[in-house]
């Protein structure tokens, strides 16, 4: 009886362990991303060895990709077997499995069996199997697994929640090489992403060779920057090779050809495409261009059709993106040809639907009909809904929040959800902007991406879920000038997209996802040489690398997801054995904190250096006689990018201004300006300074230093300083130039003050600036 009792208890414990294991994967044995729909743990491991055999009937190409990968990492010479063998790995096509991407995977100590009704399903089964092996299986050179090439035994029954799981890659603002795109394809396919939306045409560049219109790449692929001519393009053969590479990994490449807006690069090559036919250049700055294509000309439509004729020969995708977003229609209002076309079509203004919006809808519908002849379905940004008359076959990509997707799905359109408000714009900041690389703005930490549900409740409540094809993250490239930055923005948020697109919503668990990410997936990304984002230690009151104090100072750190932090106070670089941060650090003397995030897998973030500086209050300056409000400014015309450029200038002009905000607009064109004067502070204490100017000083101490930073956005990059109440010297350097596509005027020239660590940064009142 006692034996039977213990047997029952043991069985219950095993059952409970299996049940918990199927939900909480974040252990050393099961770290698959995206989490499978159903995973049942089992005891033991399958061991990959030189004697392992791989058999695949009618799926040899999938099996060969798998074999090539494991041979490269292990140094083995495994070959495909002509027959199924005991103890081997078997891939079988089984038509009884429902769903083209569904699969089953059975891993035991005695063998591995993957089944699916399609090769794509088998490919995904093997991606899951690879994630059961040590992360070093992703190595590009032969290596060793310290504990052997073991895969934890389990049974998986899996299928995706959504048919569409996508990533937009913008190759126009900055050019991605074919090699970089292939690297992304390798990683995306690991995580069961099945669509790349390739953004090929823009105001800033045209990236695809079109043989009928050679000047699109001769002129349109290149733009002028402060560093000279920049650009590049893909030949048709290069793109065909890329498409083939992606198809082998079951990724569909969807081309985007913007129309009628975002096409200044094409208009630069062929000015007759616009209403005014003026000679222009590819747009050297970011933002929305007001010059768009002219739909009043039949030659414009012929151009669009000619481009499509060549693009469909390169991209076999059944989906074709025609853009349609951010197309200002102002020129159409005064263009005789556009107005004539509107009259011919009988369009009139209606509430919420001006006739020019209907003209844009006409462009969409005409091109949809043309693409339909090739068997293509169009995708357009959610603005294509605005003119009405949109065919039900058109797919709407909802980017301005969820509303476009809600309206479209409830009207019977298929939709792809890529909400800029839902964490799916991965060019947004994923940590405190004060310490993160320059970005376009916004805030989308990985927790926000992971929390997104592609089916809005307004769609679900009406039973229209079936119209939601799935989610997509968008990697816009305005602030991604190199491969490292492209990686940094996309990963690991791409893995969160993978899970929200694949895993059943009720099985999502961010804590468990984070464990799988931090303990396993990050090692796999490292093997692919991906420069992924690791949360940096941040100060919750606003990160600052230079904290002044007068008596004592407490410095607090956090991370955007719970991670271990380690630090030193002796000037040395922190490592895995350094002191763990567990509570706020208190200081009564000056010190230097070096602090970094340490992931469970042993990978560390870059080090933050935070100086805490004990200061006496900087004394106030005695007020000059005849105190007068304002600032003195000297400015010199020309393009300057570093403070050192000013050392030898002699062409200064002088004037007075009322506020540092007035440093913009001093004169036409590029110029440098230096403002000097006095600023009044109301009370004794430590002040934190924030500004986007090049450099600023208070009482001859540098408090802002953005010198030689290429991309400026509204982010603090300042210090703190202890000041006595009263007047203090201030000096500000401002460059009115375009840096890496961003005019300085967009960021402004204000200098903001915050008293202490609490509260908000505020602009100084004009009456608190004085001439010195």
Where are the regions that the model predicts?
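Feature activates predominantly on carbohydrate-active enzymes
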Residues: 98-319, 335, 366, 370, ...
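Short, compositionally stereotyped local motifs that mark structural "simplifiers"
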Residues: 24, 508, 514-680, 686, ...
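Flexible, acidic glycine-rich loops studded with aromatic residues
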Residues: 378-394, 398-553
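Acidic, contiguous N-terminal accessory segments
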Residues: 11, 15, 19, 23-160, ...
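Short beta-strand-plus-loop segments that form exposed binding edges in beta-rich domains
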Residues: 732-741
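Active-site neighborhood of glycoside hydrolase catalytic domains
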Residues: 281-284, 288-392, 399-407
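Bacterial N-terminal signal peptides that target proteins for export
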Residues: 1-10
């Amino acid at each position: 009886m006692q034996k039977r009792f213990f047997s029952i208890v043991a069985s219950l414990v095993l059952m409970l362990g299996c049940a918990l294991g199927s939900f909480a994967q974040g252990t050393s044995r099961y770290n698959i991303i995206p989490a499978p729909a159903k995973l049942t743990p089992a005891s033991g491991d399958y061991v990959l060895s030189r004697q392992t055999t791989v058999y695949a009937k009618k799926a040899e190409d999938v099996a060969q990709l798998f074999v090539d990968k494991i041979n490269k990492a292990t140094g083995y010479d495994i070959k495909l077997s002509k027959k199924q063998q005991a103890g081997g790995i078997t891939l079988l096509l089984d038509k009884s499995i429902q769903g083209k991407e569904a699969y089953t995977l059975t891993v035991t100590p005695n063998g591995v069996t993957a089944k699916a009704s399609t090769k794509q399903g088998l490919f995904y089964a093997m991606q899951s199997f690879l994630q059961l092996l040590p992360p070093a299986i992703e190595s590009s050179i032969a290596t060793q697994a310290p504990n052997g090439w073991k895969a934890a035994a389990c049974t998986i029954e899996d299928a995706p929640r959504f048919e569409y799981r996508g990533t937009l890659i913008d190759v126009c603002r900055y050019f991605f090489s074919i090699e970089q795109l292939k690297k992304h394809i390798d990683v995306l396919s690991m995580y069961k992403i099945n669509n790349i939306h390739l953004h090929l045409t823009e105001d800033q560049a045209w990236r695809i060779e079109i043989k009928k219109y050679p000047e699109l790449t001769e002129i349109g692929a290149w733009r002028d920057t402060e560093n000279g001519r920049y650009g590049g393009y893909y030949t048709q053969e290069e793109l065909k090779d890329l498409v083939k590479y992606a198809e082998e990994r079951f990724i569909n490449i969807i081309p985007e050809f913007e129309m009628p807006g975002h096409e200044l690069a094409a208009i630069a090559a062929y000015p007759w495409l616009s209403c005014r036919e003026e000679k222009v250049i590819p747009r050297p700055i970011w933002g929305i261009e007001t010059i768009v294509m002219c739909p009043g000309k039949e030659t414009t439509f012929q151009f669009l059709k000619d481009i499509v004729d060549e693009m469909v020969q390169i991209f076999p995708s059944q989906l074709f993106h025609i853009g349609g977003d951010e197309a200002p229609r102002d020129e159409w209002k005064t263009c005789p040809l556009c107005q004539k076309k509107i009259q011919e079509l009988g369009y009139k203004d209606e509430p919420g639907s001006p006739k020019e919006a209907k003209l844009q809808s006409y462009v969409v519908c005409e091109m949809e009909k043309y693409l339909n002849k090739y068997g293509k379905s169009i995708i357009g940004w959610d603005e294509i809904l605005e003119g009405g008359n949109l065919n039900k076959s058109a797919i709407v990509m909802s980017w301005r929040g969820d509303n476009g997707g809600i309206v479209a799905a409830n009207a019977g359109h298929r939709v792809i959800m890529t909400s800029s408000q839902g964490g799916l714009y991965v060019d947004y900041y994923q940590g405190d902007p004060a310490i993160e690389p320059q970005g376009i703005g916004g805030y989308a930490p990985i927790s926000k991406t992971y929390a997104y549900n592609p089916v809005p409740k307004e769609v679900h409540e009406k039973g229209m879920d079936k119209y939601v094809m799935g989610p997509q993250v968008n990697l816009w490239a305005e602030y991604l000038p190199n491969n490292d930055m492209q990686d940094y923005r996309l990963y690991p948020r791409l893995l969160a997209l993978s899970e929200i697109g694949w895993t059943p919503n009720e099985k999502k668990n961010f804590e468990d996802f984070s464990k799988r990410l931090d303990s396993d997936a990050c090692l796999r990304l490292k093997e692919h040489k991906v420069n992924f984002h690791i949360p940096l230690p941040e100060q919750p009151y606003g990160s600052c690398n230079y904290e002044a104090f007068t008596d004592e100072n407490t410095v607090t750190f956090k991370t955007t997801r719970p991670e271990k932090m380690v630090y030193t106070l002796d000037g040395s670089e922190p490592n895995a054995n350094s002191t763990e941060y567990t509570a706020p650090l208190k200081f009564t003397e000056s010190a230097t904190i070096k602090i970094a995030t340490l992931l469970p897998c042993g990978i560390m973030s870059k080090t933050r250096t935070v100086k805490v500086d004990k200061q006496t209050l900087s004394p106030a300056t005695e007020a000059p006689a005849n105190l007068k409000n304002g600032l003195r400014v000297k400015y010199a015309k020309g393009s300057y990018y570093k403070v050192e450029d000013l050392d030898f200038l002699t062409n200064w002009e002088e004037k007075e201004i009322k506020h540092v905000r007035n440093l913009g607009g001093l004169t036409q064109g590029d110029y440098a300006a230096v403002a000097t004067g006095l600023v009044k502070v109301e009370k004794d204490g430590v002040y934190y300074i924030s500004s986007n100017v090049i450099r600023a000083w208070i009482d001859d101490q540098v408090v802002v230093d953005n010198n030689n930073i290429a991309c400026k956005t509204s982010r603090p990059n300042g210090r703190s300083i202890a000041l006595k109440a009263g007047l203090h010297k201030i000096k500000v350097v401002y460059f009115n130039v375009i840096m890496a596509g961003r005019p300085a005027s967009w960021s402004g020239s204000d200098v903001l003050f915050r008293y202490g660590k609490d509260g908000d940064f505020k602009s100084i009142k004009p009456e608190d600036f004085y001439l010195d």
